[in-house]
Amino acid sequence: MKIKQVHVRASKIKLKETFTIALGTIESADSAIVEIETEEGLVGYGEGGPGIFITGETLAGTLETIELFGQAIIGLNPFNIEKIHEVMDKISAFAPAAKAAIDIACYDLMGQKAQLPLYQLLGGYDNQVITDITLGIDEPNVMAQKAVEKVKLGFDTLKIKVGTGIEADIARVKAIREAVGFDIKLRLDANQAWTPKDAVKAIQALADYQIELVEQPVKRRDLEGLKYVTSQVNTTIMADESCFDAQDALELVKKGTVDVINIKLMKCGGIHEALKINQICETAGIECMIGCMAEETTIGITAAAHLAAAQKNITRADLDATFGLETAPVTGGVSLEAKPLLELGEAAGLGISH
């Protein structure tokens, strides 16, 4: 099996409502959709959702980089994923969303060629994933009302975006907990907004509110600060922006910096690198979450769900980006309907078509 053509197009899908985090506000899911065609006529689908707040990538830059990658991998076998990543790394030192788009399409082709759903090729641990759902930053009463609505849809785990000041953040969490009760798990994500001391103060102030975990409380490069927070609180601390690739994961693990690591395909460059991160973490006794960018659509979320289902050490999922989309850019894959259970089915590869 050899790659014959690589096509890329821009996809811009309006969100049902704006999504605000500590780093900024997102109004649409802007991503690059890739189709890799083989000489025998198979077509693999990939996606690069460039999260400018996280990776610094733009849609225009991602499209251009994918064009360069596409020209360079013509004639290669999608199964030779190590070689394909070597080719991409020589062209661009970073560009994780662009690399993820090519990577995901190659894995889709592998599944199609093997006539197996992708999760079977990646480990086959399960065929479904349970995801949380995220509440963007808003006034406490508004977030509490939305939390109740999400619980009515069947979600038992809510991820709460915080990061506009610890007093306001504490008020948000208290309002949500009072609205949904204590049977619902609450996760917090500060997106690097707190100082280490403020993080400890906020987490300790919320001790009675049973927070499951706190994600990326401090600046991504402040590993000492991250370790300080982890050492000072009983709540589970998770790295997100501090872990882009396997090298980052190794450093976090060696230093005992956090309790959990969040893997995102758009952060690490695709499934190939994500597997390395998970293997490092599993060896060290560190569980992983699989997360997503708000810019992702059906393809990226479906690929992440297959990886999460396949690997036992990926114990949590935050794969809710499709729930906010007005429409989907492709047919098949995970549903746009907001529901906690993502069922993957038995279609070969990702189960996606144009």
Curated annotation (Swiss-Prot):
One of its GO terms (biological process) is amino acid catabolic process. Keywords: Isomerase, Magnesium, Metal-binding. GO terms for molecular function: magnesium ion binding; racemase and epimerase activity; racemase and epimerase activity, acting on amino acids and derivatives. Its EC number is 5.1.1.-. InterPro entries: Dipeptide_epimerase, Enolase-like_C_sf, Enolase-like_N, Enolase_C-like, Mandel_Rmase/mucon_lact_enz_CS, Mandelate_racemase_C, Mandelate_racemase_N_dom. Mg(2+) binds at residues 189, 215, 240. Gene3D superfamilies: Enolase-like C-terminal domain, Enolase-like, N-terminal domain. Binds 1 Mg(2+) ion per subunit. Substrate binds at residues 134, 159-161, 191, 264, 292-295, 318-320. Its cofactor is Mg(2+). Belongs to the mandelate racemase/muconate lactonizing enzyme family. Catalyzes the epimerization of L-Ile-L-Tyr to L-Ile-D-Tyr (in vitro). Catalyzes the epimerization of dipeptides, with a preference for substrates with a hydrophobic or basic amino acid in the first position, followed by an aromatic residue in the second position. Has epimerase activity with L-Ile-L-Tyr, L-Val-L-Tyr and L-Arg-L-Tyr (in vitro). Part of a large, functionally divergent protein family. Protein modeling and substrate docking was used to predict the substrate specificity, prior to biochemical analysis. This is Hydrophobic dipeptide epimerase. The lineage of its organism: Bacteria, Bacillati, Bacillota, Bacilli, Lactobacillales.
